[in-house]
């Protein structure tokens, strides 16, 4: 099996919906979601090179669960790689999303490692100010920054929606380059 030095993942987290009004805007109304146990059961660690960086998108209500996922996949948390401050699709105003207590307008991408992956650049910025596109689609700028930060190494995007040049992909919205089945 091919091993990767960069794994970029945006799991389809399942959220508790507290009202009928929120149900229409929830992740479940846009794409199939996965339970935390199902996400943890994916054999992502088997894809990882001895020295590998994991970039894991999460929303703030999933912080605790993200640590469980990183542990299950064999990675150790290092830092927040990116903070995406969302702008409205057609203006530079800040986007107002859903939220359990406050209205969310940011997502974070955690950086975790296995071994000692090599950082190629020291000037990659953390904050990404970018417009929202379709539900849960992450800004292309994040992928570009990962490429600069980590260099031209074997890399894969899990739960991918597109097939960018230089990346292997896996997901239900793309022609996957690998097979990835749950561990038994």
Label every model-predicted segment:
Residues 1-184:
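Class I S-adenosyl-L-methionine-dependent methyltransferase catalytic core
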